[in-house]
Amino acid sequence: MNIIHLIAKDLRLQRNFVLPLMLLEVTGYLAYALQIPSHIPGVAFGLLHGVALIGDFLICHRTMIAEEKNRALMFIKTLPVSTPEIVIAKFGVNILLVGLNTGILLALWGGGREFGWIEVAPSLTTHLVLVGLTMHWLNNAFFITISLVFSSEHAVWVPFPALFVVITVILNFKQIKIVLHLEPFVDLLQRREALFVGLIWAIIVGFVVMCSWTLKHKRIFA
Amino acid sequence: MGVTSIAQDSLTVDRLRARLGDFWLNDISFSIAPGQVTALLGHNGAGKTTTLRLIMGIIRKDFGHVSLGGFDHVRDEKEFKQRIGFVQEESFFYKGMTVRELCAFVSPFYGAWNKGLSRQLLQALDLPGDKKLGHLSKGMRTKVSLVLALSHEPSVLLLDEPTSGLDPRARVEILKLLRKVTHEGGTTVLFSTHNLHEVDEIADRLIILDRGRVLAEESLAALRCKTGPSWNLEHYYLALVP
């Protein structure tokens, strides 16, 4: 129950941030996507994930800055709440917000294709939705881990440039796959969706455990 | 305003040890009997805040035990904190929340949260429920901390310099409330302060810390008895901690 209360608190604190962020992302994405010629398949979809990746980062930054700015983790620690509960709640609220953010962008993609605004591939499948969401959760979890382990939302800016590398990889994944001979591995993961999703979730759970352990063993909490 | 205490437990601190940079807190031991008001005295940097934060688990100890009514502060963290109310010198709240929102956020964590008492305390301390915490003065934020610390009717109240930097009116209001919870509710109190007048006014016992060690632990009544009419806490303190 404590986890739910902590998540509810974060959702309340972020309510004025999430809607403008999503509106900005949707309009920003549409402004670019509608200019992309339809004969370049996959670019608009790559761009969609690029926008969502920056959204993942901003969501993490916002949820962490709410604690950092007010040094509120110090206050939370005085309540009858365990350290793992604090960490799980932080990951939980991010999973919810990133799910909502990516979900809206994917719905925009699906709707766009359905109504003929966007003509390029791919069509939205369950596989694409699941893999897309999982990758965004992983991306966001990476930033939360950095922020919690170093007890500072400022720390998340250090790996921020890596986001652009990830976006470039997404946009050029077909070529990268060929050059690095990753086809068999990617094919396997594509065939065994559950294995792929399971692997990513194992990493996310690993991040949660690592953060709980680090915070528990830190000299000063927060 | 009916302030009651949920249990009569004694707080025991046993050989508490911690290192923070080049500062060492060395073998801090004391026990506070139920209903007793104990003042933690010492110069700046003596280890008062560190001791309180160690008890609350905000700072990790190197060695030692802290228990309240048989609950260890690390092993039984939740049960331990259910029985404690803590007021920090600086109130680290979410500044965007209103006072009422903060109370609503904190209340579900405590099994014994008393909504009626919380409302009464807000009223008695003249706190505006709809005001954002970021817009409150330091004194008001300390009062909010006190409301949060008292509304679950803890058996022990830990206060880190609760009246420091407050105007005389806020200071008097807070001391009045403290007297009420100790005398009427029988709550055990451990508070750190630099104000010797406050100690003389409300404490039963004092613990003097110096450079991370307990220098003295005395009952004020015994000291007054020993010294007679010439009793002066300031002289006693300065003789011990030059």
What do the PLM-derived regions correspond to, one by one?
Chain B
Residues 172-185:
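Helical segment within the ABC ATPase nucleotide-binding domain
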Residues 199-201:
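A short, surface-exposed alpha-helical micro-motif characterized by mixed small hydrophobic
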Residues 217-218:
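ABC ATPase "signature
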